[in-house]
A protein has these predicted regions:
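Retroviral integrase
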Residues: 1-88, 132-167
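Charged alpha-helix within mobile-element recombinases
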Residues: 80-141
């Protein structure tokens, strides 16, 4: 990839449908802890459901999350997580293909897909972002790799351009 990230942690809030994919350098409890803490942002977690992997169990314990685990080796017992993973994978591939970017950009595309999906209104007229944060997303919803024209804010001329002028 573009970074040292070799793994990913996908998380889904079943109540709000909010999801995210965190590229991780390793499958360590520390990396999992940071991702889980960022995702929950201090919100109450009524149940943390996982596949029971050691790093997730350790991180959930450190965060004082009530835990439950699926049966090991039986993905059909964890259909919500498996479907979330499939959705993020398909959405990430679509963004990469649409942008014409190589697979190495997955570390940018996966989180970008999640933000775009999280801010899209559902059948009830509200987005998962709204159900989580109590207000709709205020930022621009731009797909990964789209062409943009950037206009920097006005700044004081420091004369640096004259320093580098070759004429």
């Amino acid at each position: 990839g573009l970074t040292d990230d070799q793994d990913a942690l996908t998380i889904k809030d079943v109540f709000s449908d909010l999801k995210h994919c965190y590229p991780l350098v390793s499958k360590s409890a520390e990396d999992a802890y940071d991702a889980m803490q960022h995702f929950t942002e201090g919100r109450l977690v009524s149940l943390w459901y996982s596949d029971g992997s050691g790093e997730l169990e350790s991180a959930a314990s450190k965060l004082c999350f009530p835990k439950d685990t699926s049966l090991p080796g039986t993905p059909q017992n964890n259909a919500i997580a498996e479907r979330n993973n499939k959705d993020i994978l398909q959405g990430t591939r679509t963004l990469l293909a649409q942008a014409g970017l190589p697979c190495a950009f997955w570390v940018k595309a996966a989180p970008a897909y999640c933000v775009l999906d999280n801010t899209e209104p559902r059948e009830d007229g509200f987005s998962p972002w709204y159900h989580t944060h109590g207000e709709e997303f205020k930022g621009l919803r731009l797909p990964l790799g789209c062409a943009v024209i950037y206009f920097p804010a006005g700044t004081k001329d420091s004369g640096a351009t004259e320093k580098w002028d070759i004429t």
